[in-house]
Amino acid sequence: MKLPIYLDYAATTPVDPRVAEKMFQYMTMDGIFGNPASRSHRYGWQAEEAVDVARNQVADLINADHREIVFTSGATESNNLAIKGVAHFYKKKGKHIITSKTEHKAVLDTCRQLEREGFEVTYLEPESNGIIPMARLEAAMRDDTILVSIMHVNNEIGVIHDIDAIGELCRSKGIIFHMDAAQSAGKLPIDVQATKVDLISISGHKMYGPKGIGALYVRRKPRIRLEAQMHGGGHERGMRSGTLPTHQIVGLGEASAIAKAEMATDNVRIAKLRDKLWNGIKHIEETYVNGDMNQRTSGSLNVSFNYVEGESLMMALKDLAVSSGSACTSASLEPSYVLRALGLNDEMAHSSIRFSIGRFTTEEEIDHAIEVITQSIDKLREMSPLWEMFKDGIDLNQVQWAHH
């Protein structure tokens, strides 16, 4: 067993060895290294063919047409292109956008930028289980609403939104629906023929593909128009200029094909490990799961250990690679904005740890994790005066702390 044990699959996944092996064939002089846009010789044609195959593999993952897939540098760029692209193209129709308070920063900060440009954004509050109620979404819709951007799966707590219902509602009102699927593509079935979603952001490195590559699904029927954010040679049907990185695209394609083939078996195994982990630690006093327990992805478990500081717990869990909050905001000392939006107080939000399990997690690793977590919590609580006061029956919310 390799230490530390990697339990941070929601931050990134290792590249599947089968994907890495395939990528190696598209980089060196011995391989297919040409520019896919070079139309005058075999090096370019072979690269273009490899890109076409990968485009089909990504499209197959979500049951789309290959012409609806635009390659980007990742989900952050896809979110930017989708949200800014729609806002700028349809601004004469309206300037109102709806999103939620628990979105990834790549969506929230893009919306903030649009606010600076004169757009109006409504940030919906979730229920305490992390899910946005449909009635709240419908109530926020106006005649000038042009876009709804709601994530499929939350990156911190793993809850799943009902995208079919959101899609139906948006389509009935003539509003474009964008979905950030960084955490769900390759892990949950997505079918764009059945779900009325217009734009989907996909990330390679969240599904055992390489970092630095992603895709944006752009619906053709009804046709969604975007204003390009990256200008140049007019690649990707004018939506995203820049030489296509063949080896990364091949990696994303291969990762998509593997995910499609193995999703069902992967999910059963991962859910078993997740339940094993929770069953192994839920007996610890004052331990709570954040987010809906049923409507969540198989690999995700966000737990608050009351009266334990999240940062000190992470230090104590040095054998486990876990995070408090998302990797993108883990450098800040602020409590998770996602958990605060669920109604958790600062203390509970600060004492949360995100465990995310994936394709290469083993049972032995989970057993070790349970042991380490149990010991660490005991040790930290032994040192905590707050825990002692709580055990003595003192209501800490009523305590008047002296200010020095």
From Swiss-Prot:
Residue numbers binding [2Fe-2S] cluster: 328
Subcellular location field: Cytoplasm
Predominant localisation class: cytoplasm
UniProt cofactor(s): pyridoxal 5'-phosphate
Residues that hold pyridoxal 5'-phosphate according to the record: 75-76, 155, 183, 203-205, 243
Coiled-coil blocks: none
Pfam families, per database record: Aminotran_5
UniProt keyword Iron-sulfur present: yes
Keyword tags: 2Fe-2S, Cytoplasm, Iron, Iron-sulfur, Metal-binding, Pyridoxal phosphate, Transferase
Gene Ontology MF terms: 2 iron, 2 sulfur cluster binding; cysteine desulfurase activity; metal ion binding; pyridoxal phosphate binding
EC id: 2.8.1.7
Active-site residues per Swiss-Prot or TrEMBL entry: 328 (cysteine persulfide intermediate)
Catalytic activity: (sulfur carrier)-H + L-cysteine = (sulfur carrier)-SH + L-alanine
Residues annotated with N6-(pyridoxal phosphate)lysine modification: 206
Signal sequence extent: none
Family: Belongs to the class-V pyridoxal-phosphate-dependent aminotransferase family. NifS/IscS subfamily.
Protein name in UniProt: Cysteine desulfurase IscS
Organism whose genome encodes this protein: Shewanella oneidensis (strain ATCC 700550 / JCM 31522 / CIP 106686 / LMG 19005 / NCIMB 14063 / MR-1)
